[in-house]
Amino acid sequence: MFQTQILVRFGDLDPAGIAYYPNLVNYLHEAFEDFFRGHVGRPYPELYREGLGFPTVKLEVEYHRPVQYGDHVDVAVVVEHVGRSSVRLRYEASVQGRPVFTGRNVVVTVNLKTFETLPVPDWLRERLEAARG
């Protein structure tokens, strides 16, 4: 399992003063990018420049309690499954140990020039399998 932390900024809030729900999806993507940098060992922008992309093809988010301005959201990233060209990840987000939202997404490995599906590269498969939970 990989852990990262995200700070809730003023611009993330809705008129009710809590994090606007689409921003929680952005937090999941930030955790995904942090996972690539911290666990996979390859910054996501580097892979992007090399033409390797991971678009989300399925996304689920379940909200448990409000996320507020100034919260430090701890997000755990767990690899649930590595397929031929897809990866399913689970995200568990909490503030001070209390769950605030959970999510899952499936990403597919693609060539960014053609958007054709590619097999998960062997070097990446090895790193992803090491993070399976």
What are these regions (language model features)?
Residues 1-74, 80-133:
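Terminal targeting signals and extreme-terminal segments of soluble enzymes
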